[in-house]
Amino acid sequence: MGSVGLLGLLLLRLSVTASGSGAGTGSGTGSGTGTGTGQLVGSPATGPALQPREPLSYSRLQRKSLAVDFVVPSLFRVYARDLLLPPWSSSEPRAGWTEARGSLALDCAPLLRLLGPPPGVSWAEGASSPAPAQARTLTRVLKGGSVRKLRRAKQLVLELGEEAILEGCVGPSPEEVTAGLLQFNLSELFSWWIRHGEGRLRIRLMPEKKASAVGREGRLSAAIRASQPRLLFQILGTGHSSLESPTSLPSPPPDPFAWNLTWIMKDSFPFLSHRSRYGLECSFDFPCELEYSPPLHDLGNQSWSWRRVPSEEASQMDLLDGPETEHSKEMPRGSFLLLNTSANSKHTILSPWMRSSSEHCKLAVSVHRHLQPSGRYVAQLLPHNEPGREILLVPTPGKHGWTVLQGRIGRPENPFRVALEYISSGNRSLSAVDFFALKNCSEGTSPGSKMALQSSFTCWNGTVLQLGQACDFHQDCAQGEDEGQLCSQLPAGFYCNFENGFCGWSQGILTPHNPRWQVRTLKDARVQDHRGHALSLSTTDVPTSESATVTSATFPAPMKNSPCELRMSWLIHGVLRGNVSLVLVENKTGKEQSRMVWHVATNEGLSLWQWTVLPLLDVADRFWLQIVAWWGQGSRATVAFDNISISLDCYLTISGEEKMLQNTAPKSRNLFERNPNKDPRPWENTRETPVFDPTVHWLFTTCGASGPHGPTQAQCNNAYRNSNLSVVVGSEGPLKGIQTWKVPATDTYSISGYGAAGGKGGKNTMMRSHGVSVLGIFNLEKGDTLYILVGQQGEDACPSTNRLIQKVCIGENNVIEEEIRVNRSVHEWAGGGGGGGGATYVFKMKDGVPVPLIIAAGGGGRAYGAKTDTFHPERLENNSSVLGLNGNSGAAGGGGGWNDNTSLLWSGKSLLEGATGGHSCPQAMKKWGWETRGGFGGGGGGCSSGGGGGGYIGGNAASNNDPEMDGEDGVSFISPLGILYTPALKVMEGHGEVNIKHYLNCSHCEGDECHMDPESHKVICFCDHGTVLAEDGVSCIVSPTPEPHLPLSLVLSVVTSALVAALVLAFSGIMIVYRRKHQELQAMQMELQSPEYKLSKLRTSTIMTDYNPNYCFAGKTSSISDLKEVPRKNITLIRGLGHGAFGEVYEGQVSGVPSDPSPLQVAVKTLPEVCSEQDELDFLMEALIISKFNHQNIVRCIGVSLQALPRFILLELMAGGDLKSFLRETRPRPNQPSSLAMLDLLHVAQDIACGCQYLEENHFIHRDIAARNCLLTCPGPGRVAKIGDFGMARDIYRASYYRKGGCAMLPVKWMPPEAFMEGIFTSKTDTWSFGVLLWEIFSLGYMPYPSKSNQEVLEFVTSGGRMDPPKNCPGPVYRIMTQCWQHQPEDRPNFAIILERIEYCTQDPDVINTALPVEYGPLMEEEEKVPMRPQDPEGIPPLLVSPPQAKREEGPDPAAPPPLPSTSSGKAAKKPTAAELSGRVTRGPAVEGGHVNMAFSQSNPASELHKVQGSRNKPTSLWNPTYGSWFTEKPTKKNNPPATKGHHDRGNLGREGSCTVPPNVAAGRLPGASLLLEPSSLTASMKEVPLFRLRHFPCGNVNYGYQQQGLPFEGTTAPGSSQYEDALLKTPPGP
């Protein structure tokens, strides 16, 4: 922009201030992004009147500069037409259904703020943004000319003025604002251009051309930019929503052959105009684009804010040490900023938004430094959408007065602002600023703002996806339209799953013996997770070394700056002694350039399909892909590729900002060109060409420089003249003497840094302190800039050209020793210590901030009389959060660190201060000029003691000038970005070095060391001494050595004697051990077979139920004698059902029980013989608790058998299994309606409420009312629900489970707040749990509080949160739940009231006619794993159940909806029907982490029982490693009795504490009902366990884990595993 434009901008700002209105554009950007206190510099409150009109030529120039241009590239039209718009065809009329729409939209709020309210209308400031409404289309879209002419020109100019704003935003009625957007309808233009047009489409939006007051068009242009103009395009088909179609109209069905894509073009950074500046200079003599906080005041004496003060006025002020003359010498009379405050505050100067295209961009601020500063300056870099960072300000040398603070900004990727903060400390703080500039921020031409073209894909249900998510073989839309027929219509190669052939992939010239790529189905058993065809190559049939190449179709060039990606799945199965590469070949002009984008080299593949997404960067021409596989001898592998797709973003999306990308593609070492006329198979001989030359390395030296200052450019040019190095040496600032080097290629490099040695002392010239070496491995990318400072050796004290000093060196002058003898210290004759060695630094720049990679510390200087046995260990730091400080200085200087400041001349400087070496101590220079300076790299200067070495943390120097105290070495550093290859070692005796070379990966070698043969370019592994390389080239074997041969007779005699002796000793030992063990086993067996031995301690005492008053039955004492003893002879065990909390659970029969049929089917719970006393107490306690109850809704205890071992508890056999599994199994599904109705769920809830009422009336608190603890008599009609698990009540009954601070696991999701917060348990606790049980019943078995952990449930419930009703849950039922969940216990109803309300629900037609929710997905395990606590968590490690795998049920899988996403690695098993499961025992997965519920069956007739008993003589023994037990497995016959049909009515429940069931209901229970399974249960065989095997079962809670307080849960059973467990015998469950 010329001077006229700048003058116009200045007049525009003046007019905005004078008129008191504007667009609110801070810093001239037109977006109002400044701070709330922002104000333009030099904008007076009042100003002179301006001319009412401006020249036409000036107005036209200004209008052109303030326009907003939208340019859509012509390639977008070409690609959209070819990919999305198939030509019209009468045979395929669907192609004509595609529509193209377009519009240009602006927000009305900024435009209306500019105009102000119209006459008669008043709206508040917050109402300037009208409520959203249907966007209005302007009737006058185009200005001048015809549509035909504009189409021919492919350019549209839209002028926006007050009338258009009022028409589009306010409407015809000015009393009411109706539109939130102002839109131009461009559908006709865009539709013509996308189908028939040529070239690019350009749309220019500018202020209306009218003569008006100065600044009017500028304000209007700023308002237009603030309204965020954006261009919207849409290509859609019939049935899709449109940009302009009303949402209330019904849409026709979607077209599966038409796209629904949307594009939005807008400025990447709307707050930046195209006039964004790349530099700024403000001397405060004229108005500047700066903002202030607090605002600037030119008039008055505002002590709390900035003021612009002329220099002549400052000379008249009575300011303490204030500035009297202006810093700019070229202007004798000028102005500067002044701040005079007495408060502790922070004042800020903020720059406008800037950009930088140069690494040399810096901030320069001229301030006045006072003798006694009372504040400090801090600079902040504030990039867009990034956190700010501090800019290091370096002042010019000087004590006080005007000085320039400079800080490096660099080249930030995003636009940025710079804030200069002055932090005052009170006491009349004074600040003066004369100059504020951003310099050297432009490099070449400055690009304008970038328009981003963002694309999206809209699903049929309205879900919006990024365009890159479409056609990527991952279904994101609900109906899969993003992966449907649309993708199959793309050109060949864009979307390829190889189901219809090669998809455009082809091979070169094939011979009969050459391997070839094939499209086939993989039949290997290990890769059956993939179905369908794939592009595969087999190396099994090719014994020799070979290669194979397959080439894709040719793809057009992607859009410039597009996020282009390649997606593919690949697999390597077997042993591949070679590599596979994916090469991108770009068709450059006259040649083809190839580069590798993906590479894998492996010995043995994982045999798993892997998904890879590869960015395709910097592709500017047509390209194709090549898959190249090479293998050597011994390869037996299958290489396969599938689901290869090119993202549509490559051709239909444009990123707004042209990012300064380096090579961010995957590691690519091969970059070559070939002639298109040559053999089109360039990769056949690539194995013979080295990927890189391992002998090439880059050695960086000091370039011949020495002393405290680094080398110059001329020195390094001369030093590296005949080498492969090319460096740039800094000449000023902190980078002076630092060499910069660009990485030639993306690769892994080893960087060896060597610090410089320290100087020698005057008397000890035999040994110096060595520099430290550090070697690290780093991944570097092509174009990365490394900054390398090579440390220089500290200066030696001797020899010297000074004669007096030379005499001291050779021992002819002993003045130093004399002073030491007299004063015991050195002061007058100080000197003679060596300077500290400089450190070697290798670092990078990230956003202008140095980031260290490797720092090799320098050695400390030796003292004048240093001892020879001094040793300083190496120190290494790898934490960048540790401050890199300078070493402590005394008479000698400490070493320089990474980032610190020092004012001592003899101290070494830190890297950010320039890293120069320190001078000698002043006394040494003054007395005899003994100069022992520190080396470049932060070495400290010497005195009589040695100087400290440089490093990340500088080495310390002696504090008292001890002539025997050496300077300490610095601290080395390696970045966490790298890998430390060798530890820090002191090795360097001179100057430092840096050696960079390619790192050869030797991880496949046994010794992790290898080298590459320079002739054959093969990697050869090294072996340790005494071993040689095996034939496989990887392993090391001991080298065979010839041994002396002994006579054969002697060898035979020795071997025979040794064998006989060994056999005799072994036989004797076996006999002795066997006899001893046999005697021990006999004694133990006799002792264990005595029942009195185990019951002696139990018979002498009784168990009191008064431990917990809540469990007391009228305070009576219960003993073993109260239990009904059943003789062992009357008990017959039929088969094993599973493993319970104490031991095995069996199905059995008992006879001779009064008032019961004989034989009676029962469940027998066993207690193994070898048990702890605590287990016996638990076993008996549970028997006592269950025996106390006598109710039809509580599982009945038939009796016990305790007089013989093992001990038994006989319980009522429940064939229906647990309630939770029943609900989950009977969920209705689309192809499987449920046999349940809402009335069935109410009856189940009624049964459980009856049992709870009985417990409540007997003052018994269950504490764990949950669906998993309720059992059903049968799964069919007539079922009765009963409470069947009192494990938790048993533990609380024992008064040890709820001990404070223990490892107890509580059912948190079923507990009220007072229970888990205060430990209060009442009958209202069971009321709360019953409400959760109701939620489980009516959600059909879902886990309460879905997706919440126990901790989250605690916080949710205590904060007042409650669960939402389950799907299709009737309102009256949910009201019962909410009443049970009242926070105050007294507000919860008792079970009599709950029963009454459930009864009402059973009579309500609206409730019982409610349909159950339908499950549309496969059943997924949403249960949480419930770890349990053993009795002694400190002594017993957690034992987890690991049951054997069950066999899959044979038969075809039923039709099911598509699977839902799941994180479980297991697969859902087929769910058998009830008829199929009758008469067989099944196993289900551990869905509740240790609570695997029992399933019982009563379908075995008497004849079947005799068959089972008669077949015990031929068992098949199976060892169960989980429980250490033997099971006897025997196949059984399936008996499928028909289920009795019909639904029996339920009787009314009593309200007096006991619930009765009518006789007809009891008689209707199905005794032979089929077995109910877990949701994913598998079929298993019946098992029978002889009684004598029960003695060897372990006891205790072996299948429960526990958790120490504060530790995470351990995993339980593996997915898909199964086990048995008795729901009656479970220990207290977890949530």
Curated annotation (Swiss-Prot):
Residues 1002-1040 are annotated as: EGF-like. One of its GO terms (cellular component) is plasma membrane. Residues 21-39 have a biased composition (Gly residues). It catalyses: L-tyrosyl-[protein] + ATP = O-phospho-L-tyrosyl-[protein] + ADP + H(+). Activated upon ALKAL2 ligand-binding. ALKAL2-driven activation is coupled with heparin-binding. Following ligand-binding, homodimerizes and autophosphorylates, activating its kinase activity. Inactivated through dephosphorylation by receptor protein tyrosine phosphatase beta and zeta complex (PTPRB/PTPRZ1) when there is no stimulation by a ligand. The keyword Transmembrane applies. The chain crosses the membrane at residues 1054-1074. Glycans are attached at residues 185, 260, 301, 340, 427, 440, 461, 579, 587, 643, 724, 823, 878-879, 901, 1001. The active site is at D1264 (proton acceptor). ATP binds at L1137, G1138, H1139, G1140, A1141, F1142, G1143, E1144, V1145, K1165. Gene3D superfamilies: 2.60.120.200, Low-density Lipoprotein Receptor, Phosphorylase Kinase, domain 1, Transferase(Phosphotransferase) domain 1. It is an enzyme of class 2 (transferase). One of its GO terms (biological process) is regulation of cell population proliferation. It is a single-pass type I membrane protein. Residues 1075-1631 are cytoplasmic. Phosphorylated at tyrosine residues by autocatalysis, which activates kinase activity. In cells not stimulated by a ligand, receptor protein tyrosine phosphatase beta and zeta complex (PTPRB/PTPRZ1) dephosphorylates ALK at the sites in ALK that are undergoing autophosphorylation through autoactivation. It comes from the Eukaryota. Residues 1131-1407 form the Protein kinase domain. Residues 280-443, 494-652 form the MAM domain. It is found in: Cell membrane. Residues 60-82 are annotated as: Heparin-binding region. Keywords: ATP-binding, Cell membrane, Disulfide bond, Glycoprotein, Kinase, Membrane, Nucleotide-binding, Phosphoprotein, Receptor, Repeat, Signal, Transferase, Transmembrane, Transmembrane helix, Tyrosine-protein kinase. Disulfide bonds join C703-C716, C798-C809, C921-C943, C1002-C1010, C1005-C1021, C1023-C1036. Its EC number is 2.7.10.1. Neuronal receptor tyrosine kinase that is essentially and transiently expressed in specific regions of the central and peripheral nervous systems and plays an important role in the genesis and differentiation of the nervous system. Also acts as a key thinness protein involved in the resistance to weight gain: in hypothalamic neurons, controls energy expenditure acting as a negative regulator of white adipose tissue lipolysis and sympathetic tone to fine-tune energy homeostasis. This is ALK tyrosine kinase receptor. The lineage of its organism: Eukaryota, Metazoa, Chordata, Craniata, Vertebrata.
